[in-house]
């Protein structure tokens, strides 16, 4: 990863029923239906609402099964596709909701990539309109906010696992480089999280002076910074180490401590502090 460290002067056919009742021989008008026929007709009628095709009722029962299992056994009992299907609610003509969920997961490659997708990423996808896009984006934002609340409850230095989870959800699967700052108070509790720089796959301009200025404006006593590697490899580069030194020294001039710098991938993180590099 290369940095530009910038100084102050640079700125669902719901499946259609295909079965057809076999034509019964015509009975004389005086014929009385047998008790077996009456029982069969009663059971068939009770099996579905009046006017509903048999396949529609079956599809409805199929959608209900994951919901019932979730309520009875918890969300861990469901597959990724089943959980996505519950969010989507219904399918398309020719494709039930579970087929749509599988299609989405295949399109994005993983559940994490699906949930980290931006609204524009869903444009043109059959069956995913504005309402479903909003639901998928909102779910991830709720998770981020919940983790941020957790980070505010106690000092982040006492809960490194919470920091890892938060950062991976925040930037771990971004397709481009993002530099993020976690501004902390004197007790090392989270005050605010801000994305302070965005780059390409291999290069990003970072402004240490602007980060210091923002820390002073928020009355922060300490900082944790992080950036992602879209490749997934979290080993820091020489440029990563140089940036960390420059930022640490700039913050020290105004008595603000740089606690850690994380390099973040989709499934792993690297901590400068744990490596003894800060």
Swiss-Prot record:
Tagged with keyword Metal-binding: yes
Q: Which PROSITE patterns match?
A: MPN (PS50249), UPF0758 (PS01302)
Residues that, per the record, bind Zn(2+): 227, 229, 240
Q: Where is this motif: JAMM motif?
A: 227-240
Q: Which residues form the MPN domain?
A: 156-278
Where is the region Disordered?
A: 1-64
- Which UniProt keywords are given for this protein, alphabetically ordered? Hydrolase, Metal-binding, Metalloprotease, Protease, Zinc
What terms describe the molecular function in GO for this protein? Answer: metal ion binding; metallopeptidase activity
Per UniProt, the ranges with Low complexity bias are 22-59
The keyword RNA-binding belongs to this UniProt entry's keyword annotation: no
GO terms for biological process, alphabetical: proteolysis
Q: Please name the NCBIfam families in this protein's record.
A: PRK00024.1 (NF000642), radc (TIGR00608)
Q: Which family does it belong to?
A: Belongs to the UPF0758 family.
Q: What is this protein called?
A: UPF0758 protein BURPS668_0979
What is the organism of origin for this protein? Burkholderia pseudomallei (strain 668)
Q: What is the lineage of its organism?
A: Bacteria, Pseudomonadati, Pseudomonadota, Betaproteobacteria, Burkholderiales
């Amino acid at each position: 990863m290369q940095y530009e460290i910038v100084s102050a002067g640079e700125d669902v056919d719901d499946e259609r029923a295909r079965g057809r009742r076999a034509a019964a021989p015509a009975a004389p008008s005086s014929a009385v239906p047998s008790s077996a026929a009456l029982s069969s007709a009663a059971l068939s009628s009770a099996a579905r609402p009046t006017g509903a095709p048999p396949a529609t009722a079956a599809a409805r029962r199929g959608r209900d099964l994951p919901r019932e299992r979730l309520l009875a056994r918890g969300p861990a009992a469901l597959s990724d596709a089943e959980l996505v299907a519950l969010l989507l609610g219904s399918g398309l003509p020719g494709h039930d909701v579970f087929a749509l969920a599988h299609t989405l997961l295949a399109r994005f490659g993983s559940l994490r990539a699906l949930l980290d997708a931006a609204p524009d990423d869903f444009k043109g996808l059959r069956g995913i309109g504005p309402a479903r896009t909003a639901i998928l984006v909102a779910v991830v934002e709720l998770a981020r906010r919940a983790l941020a609340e957790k980070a505010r409850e106690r000092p982040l230095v006492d809960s490194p696992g919470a920091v890892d989870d938060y950062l991976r959800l925040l930037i771990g699967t971004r397709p481009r480089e993002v530099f993020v700052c976690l501004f902390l108070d004197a007790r090392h509790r989270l005050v605010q999280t801000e994305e302070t720089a965005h780059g390409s796959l291999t290069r990003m301009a970072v402004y240490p002076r602007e980060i210091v200025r923002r820390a002073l404006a928020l009355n922060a006593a300490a900082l944790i910074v992080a950036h992602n590697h879209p490749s997934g490899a979290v080993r820091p580069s020489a440029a990563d180490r140089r940036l960390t030194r420059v930022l640490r020294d700039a913050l020290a001039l105004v008595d603000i401590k740089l606690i850690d710098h994380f390099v973040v991938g989709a499934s792993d993180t690297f901590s400068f502090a744990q490596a003894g590099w800060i």
